């Protein structure tokens, strides 16, 4: 660890599993910080960092384990800021377990129907546990037919929460690309989230 001054560390599956913290990982990050290193947590959660951090204490992730946190939600918001003049078709639920409405709160966005949109914002599946991505193929075809670029708020295809697997926006983005659609990925493992993390 002496060779590095900064760690960019994933969240899900590394420091917690959505149900409880992984103590050894948190302790290792805390020790790294104690030696003068900086830790920036990066996650593909499609919500701003404030919502991500709000989960940490209940899960047992100590504040001493990190200096900063950057989410795919943060990087997606940066992308949406430069597209506030575009009409957006939003695909995903406002009432899911990640409370996706925080993704676009405070931004002056014009949400509309698919036939009027300039851009498709994919937050995820409406039912992350019970829906299957293939069920959305006909719906995604509307975006393909209108040549809408998709902004994928979470590049992950699935996430494990405790013992359950939940589908994520990345699964729909994969189908969209298979259908020859253009997808913009602000989150991991793509460049935007790392640039944002290093800027902080």
Segments predicted by a language model, with ranges:
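HAD-like aspartate-dependent phosphatase fold
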Residues: 1-200
